[in-house]
Regions:
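Short, small/polar-rich loop/turn modules that mediate ligand/substrate recognition or access, typified
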Residues: 179, 184, 251-253
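C-terminal substrate-recognition "lid" of short-chain dehydrogenase/reductases
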Residues: 123, 229-258, 263-264
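Substrate-binding pocket helix/loop in short-chain dehydrogenase/reductase
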Residues: 102-103, 110-112, 221
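Active-site helix of classical SDR
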Residues: 126, 163, 171
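Residue(s) in the substrate-gating loop at a strand-loop-helix junction
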Residues: 147
């Protein structure tokens, strides 16, 4: 029996990168998983590719489109998951975006885009998951994706840093407010992870003149990682599966750093 057998989970931002890896790792440990993403065709393909993995782990898999900034689509995603699996136990608020800009060039549009997905999207996801847990009258878990950028600010990504500090605040505030409903709220903070999102960030930094060649940003960040390398999504999923499992049922309000030693807190 797997570590999360019988638990019904939603993972947003699951069409690629960390989100996809979280969902696949949950399937390996017996969970029922809804992969959700704004890119419906891509997340549908991920769910289809995960069918054999689900069967091997003893769980089930489905998918749902979602715009995490649109409450109606978040509600529809949760309803679909409950229809498919009979309940919801764990909600991963993982969808996130970044768009580097020099500090003096940050626009209202840039700020609102990043804060919308990373901040408001996290809030809506937490609220709607909590409402479902309360309707069920069951214990529930909310797991939020923060970042190493939630512990200190970095140049050229000020709105992203602010949004991830916001995720930490939402995690702590939600943990306090929702404890009376037997709902826990935790999070994890990855450092530099080799994903499609980081590849795009690398290109964006070159576009604004903050990097001169491909891979420069990742090289500079990795130079201060005590483990001596950037992470892969697989480096993150041991912790995320733990946060979804009964092994972490007594944890709430905490953010777990998974950054290879970039920050020591």
């Amino acid at each position: 029996m797997g570590r999360v057998s019988g638990r019904s989970c939603i993972v947003t931002g699951a069409a690629q990168g960390i989100g996809r890896a979280i969902g696949e790792a949950l399937l390996d440990e017996g969970a029922d998983v809804c992969f959700a993403d704004i890119n419906e065709s891509k997340v549908a393909a991920v769910a289809e590719a995960s069918q054999d993995r689900a069967a091997a782990g003893g769980g089930r898999v489905t998918h749902s489109p979602v715009d995490v900034t649109d409450r109606a689509t978040v509600q529809a995603m949760i309803a679909h998951t409950v229809d498919a699996f009979g309940k919801l136990d764990v909600k991963f608020n993982n969808a996130g975006v970044n768009k580097p800009m020099n500090f003096l060039d940050v626009t209202e549009d840039n700020w609102n885009f990043i804060m919308g997905v990373n901040g408001l999207g996290c809030l809506i996801g937490m609220q709607e998951a909590a409402r479902q847990f309360i309707r069920q009258g069951t214990f529930g878990k909310i797991v939020n994706t923060a970042s190493v950028a939630s512990r200190q600010g970095y140049d050229n990504v000020a709105p992203y840093c602010a949004s991830k500090w916001g995720v930490v605040a939402l995690t702590q505030s939600g943990a306090r407010d929702l404890a009376k409903h037997d709902i826990t709220v935790t999070g994890f903070a990855p450092g530099v992870v080799a994903t499609e999102m980081w590849e795009q960030v690398d290109r964006d930094l070159m576009d604004i003149g903050a990097a001169q060649h491909p891979g420069q940003a990742m090289e500079e960040f990795s130079s201060v990682i005590l483990k001596g390398r950037v992470a892969t999504p697989a480096d993150v999923t041991g912790t995320t599966t733990f946060l979804a499992s009964q092994e972490s049922d007594y944890m709430t309000g905490q953010i777990v750093m998974i950054d290879g030693g970039m920050t020591l807190v």
